[in-house]
Regions:
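N-terminal post-signal-peptidase region of extra-cytosolic proteins
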Residues: 116-117, 225, 327
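Short hydrophobic/aromatic segments of transmembrane alpha-helices and their interfaces
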Residues: 51, 71, 241-242, 463
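Solvent-exposed soluble domains appended to multi-pass membrane proteins
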Residues: 232-240, 253-254, 259-615
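Alpha-helix initiation and N-capping motif
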Residues: 100-103, 191-195, 215, 273, ...
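Transmembrane and membrane-interface helices of multi-pass
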Residues: 1-188
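Membrane-interface segments at or immediately adjacent to transmembrane helices
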Residues: 165-251
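Short hydrophobic "helix-edge" motifs at membrane interfaces and signal-peptide entry regions
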Residues: 54, 244-246, 466-468
Length: 615
């Protein structure tokens, strides 16, 4: 009887059975990171299921066998869920489409992270594997030849493409309560689900031209800022007119260097950065403040990109890596500009040159002399990475061997403080402990920061005794990941998983120092963002700025901070904080002019990054 009923309704039974598995795959994948029944919005969950169903049925028509189609869906979902979980753990942001370009870099540093699975990860993975094995019994097939299966396959692919296109439509997102804001990617993934968010993000793999853009318009706009920089103003007596008197410019972008006290108070057994703290109190020929970054816990290359080019990640997809996605030919930068006015240009990084494509990108940015791990002599290691002491010795060695009479621009990116911070290492002991926080990762991190602080002091002491004018710039690329910062946040009443917008901004601040061995204007507590820093360095150094840098200095007067996380606007000498959707919140009588400046920035950035004449 049962067999007869099954035979009669076999197709319906198989369709229902087949359709249940993609739903299970979606919810299991989400459980790697959170409880989707509580946090994924209803319509978003429905759309995730549609994506899974479409992919499963396409695979069924391609393979002709249910078990292989379903196994493929489950394996992909399991791998995707695991990747997203560990990316969130180590970087505090979800896996996005352009992370695929970063696989090589991620692999090169993976050994220094703790991949020990939590109980939840183990349970979800076991369920995945059990269901994959159970699919051995779900083995109904399509008996059609492939040429007959081709039509439903093509129709399925077309339906999938149309549906993904709908998910990327702003009106569709609004009508169906999908969260659209890329500048909070973790929350976006949490409430939309991984698959829907990934599909929405695909729209931003390529960067569209800004409204009203033309190369001629951008060139004319850039020309309008020719000769407008402070250092070319007759009233400014700090400008250096003799090129032979240009100072050496040494820039250290230090891996994960930050002062976590910006998140709130916590006590330690000793000061973890006494030298930097002393400079921040006010020091001769020194400028200090906080630098607002676009990244946290990773994606170092984005901070490099913003500093060297003056461009901002605010106008690019969140999580994108310009070094890997956009810089494919000659691109104007601080290095190419300084080279054009007579500087010798050096880029140094004590790790693999292939990381973030640096060995390819640096020459395109104008660096003539490259040094990577194999070029460092007398290597000393801290944990698994070449020490900052070794890295700073390389700077001194480069300075001492540069051509006589030619100023040097040395850009040095360190590795010593790279995460993770949970393993123990022979020969490395924590010298700093945070009282009552019971976080060994935090203790290790602070101990590393103290070592860097000591090495920075030695570097500045060296250049304080050289005859040539030299300016040293030091800043961190980003704060460490949540494993380190969570206990500091918790001690100050904050949950790292549920930070308010104002609290989130604190996670994107690092200290910076501009120091010179000759007279420059001093300042303390001067906050800025990475895109402005190079122009500010040239202004402080007395080196003339080019047209784009002059524009940035002017823009900075109205928008002192622009990053992927925040855009702060000055109105009547006060600072209005807003998100990077801030055009709607300005509300001043100068709104149109201010918006025009931001639009000009978008035009100029697109021109210099994607439409430069030398490309």
């Amino acid at each position: 009887m049962i067999k007869k009923i099954y035979k009669k309704y076999e197709i319906i039974f198989n369709v229902v059975l087949f359709s249940i598995f993609p739903i299970a795959a979606f919810y299991l994948m989400e459980f790697y990171e959170h409880n989707p029944f509580e946090e994924v919005r209803f319509m978003a969950a429905f759309f995730n299921i549609i994506l899974f169903e479409l992919i499963a049925w396409i695979l069924y028509f391609v393979t002709g066998r249910a078990k292989w189609a379903l196994r493929t869906v489950f394996i992909v979902a399991m791998v995707f869920g695991l990747i997203n979980h560990y990316v969130m753990l180590f970087r505090s942001t979800p896996f996005v489409p352009w992370d695929i370009f970063s696989i090589g870099t991620a692999t090169s540093v993976a050994s220094n992270y703790d991949f020990a699975p939590t109980a939840g990860v183990v349970v979800v993975t076991v369920i995945f594997i059990a269901l994959i094995m159970l699919m051995h019994f779900v083995d109904f097939r399509i008996k059609w030849k492939f040429r007959f299966r081709l039509i439903p396959t093509v129709l399925g692919i077309l339906a999938l493409c149309l549906f993904v296109n709908a998910l990327q439509d702003e009106d569709f997102q609004t009508d169906n309560y999908l969260y659209p804001f890329l500048f909070t990617p973790a929350y976006m993934t949490k409430v939309n689900g991984m698959a829907v968010t990934f599909a929405m993000d695909l729209k931003f793999v390529a960067v569209d031209k800004p409204d009203g853009y033309s190369r001629q318009k951008a060139k004319e706009l850039l020309d309008s800022y020719s000769g407008t920089d402070d250092n070319s103003d007759v009233a400014n007596n700090t400008a250096i007119t003799d090129k032979s008197d240009y100072p050496n410019i040494i820039v250290v972008m230090d891996e994960a260097f930050s002062d976590l006290s910006v998140l709130g108070d916590f006590d330690t057994n000793t000061d973890y950065m006494p030298f930097v703290h002393s400079l921040e109190k006010g020091n001769e020929n020194t400028i200090t403040g906080y630098l607002n970054t676009s990244v946290c816990g990773g994606n170092t290359a984005d901070t490099e990109f913003e500093f060297l080019t003056g461009n901002t990640m605010a106008f690019l997809p969140v999580g994108s890596i310009p070094y890997q996605q956009y810089i494919k030919s000659t691109t104007p930068s601080l290095a190419s500009y300084l080279k054009s006015i007579g500087y010798a240009t050096y880029a140094q990084h004590p790790y693999y040159g292939s990381g973030w494509n640096r060995d390819t990108v640096y020459p395109l940015l104008g660096f003539d002399n490259l040094s990577f791990m194999q070029d460092y002599s007398n290597q000393r290691f801290v944990r698994k990475y070449i020490s900052d002491e070794t890295s700073f010795d390389r700077i001194i060695e480069t300075y001492e061997n540069k051509p006589d009479g030619q100023p040097a621009f040395i850009f040095n990116v360190t590795m010593q403080n790279h995460g993770g911070y949970t393993d123990t290492y022979y020969g490395f002991d924590n010298t700093v402990t945070a009282d009552k926080l019971n976080n060994s990762a935090l203790d290790q991190y602070l101990s590393l920061i103290k070592m860097t602080d000591e090495d920075l002091k030695k570097l500045i002491e060296y250049f304080s005794n050289v005859d040539e004018k030299t300016i040293v710039v030091f800043f961190g690329d980003h704060q460490p990941n949540d494993t380190v910062a969570s206990s500091v946040l918790a001690a100050n009443g904050m949950d790292y998983n549920n930070l308010s917008n104002e609290e989130l901004k604190l996670r994107y601040q690092v200290p910076y120092v501009i120091w010179a061995n000759y007279d420059i204007d001093e300042a303390a507590g001067k906050d800025t963002s990475v895109n402005y820093l190079a122009a500010n360095v040239l202004k402080a150094a007395g080196v003339p700025t080019n047209d784009y840098q002059s524009f940035l200095l002017k823009l900075q007067e109205e928008y002192p901070i622009i990053s992927a996380v925040r855009t702060d606007k000055t109105t009547d000498k006060t600072l209005d904080k807003a998100s990077n959707k801030s055009d709607k919140a300005i509300g001043s009588k100068n709104k149109q002019a201010d918006s025009d400046m931001l639009n000009d920035y978008k035009l100029l950035q697109y021109y210099r990054l994607f439409d430069w004449e030398d490309k």
